[in-house]
Amino acid sequence: MAFKDVLLTLASYPEPTPVSVIDDAVSVAAALGAHLAAVSCEVHAEVRASLLGYVILDIPALIAREAAKSRENAKALLAAFEASADKSGVRHETIFEHCATASEAALLVDYARLRDLTIMAVPDSHDLGYAEEVIFESGRPTLILPTGPRSRPLRLDAICVAWDFSRTAARAVSDALPLLESARSVRVVTVTNEKPLDSRHSGRELAKNLARHGIEVVLDEIDAERKPIDEVLTSYVLSHGIDVLVMGAYGTPRWREFVLGGATRGLLSKPPVPILFSH
């Protein structure tokens, strides 16, 4: 199934999503020929204090100031989104919501469940739980965009699949098929000597499966050499000019960990390239 209905989440608090993320998301939607909806929330901070502290610190005024800051950021982000989408000719809509800080992630999950793909970034000021909630609870793939400066424009030409024969890796491949089918090159990489792998032949079998979709792949195995897995994958995608990394995620509400072991927080907090996560 092609990605035809895409969601972009724009954080307004405590710091706004960088405008560069908007342009990247619009570029993705344009490449996919998809409709793009941008959602941003006016966030109301929840402050706990004693009755005395509530009076001395004037908590209601503090909450009102922070809500106004969030509202201004959200409005500015949505206006920038509309300008970028109009310029690129991308069909779009804007969604302005109100929510408490504790319920923002759940609200985004509700919208993400009704879209083919969600695009989001994780600003430095945000806890990773902001993205984890969408990745784990939406039931849809999530494309995490880097927020730092990039040396070249975002493209979807060269894609790498991080493959370990797990259920979630298989789900990620399935969810990423629209991207894989339109890519100019696809690499499937397995990291060895990092954890036991269920099948040494699975890479070749996956290549056969993708070939039946008209996707020719290059198979690679790289030795972890006792390095953190996020460093291994980061080095690989940067040295091979990868545009998008595809990988699976698994977890429970109490304890979450991405496949490929320690790749989790390192890649989510500092993605070297856009990463398509699927659970």
Language-model features: locations:
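Gly/Ser-rich helix-loop-strand patches that form or flank binding pockets
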Residues: I22, S27, A31, A106-R152, ...
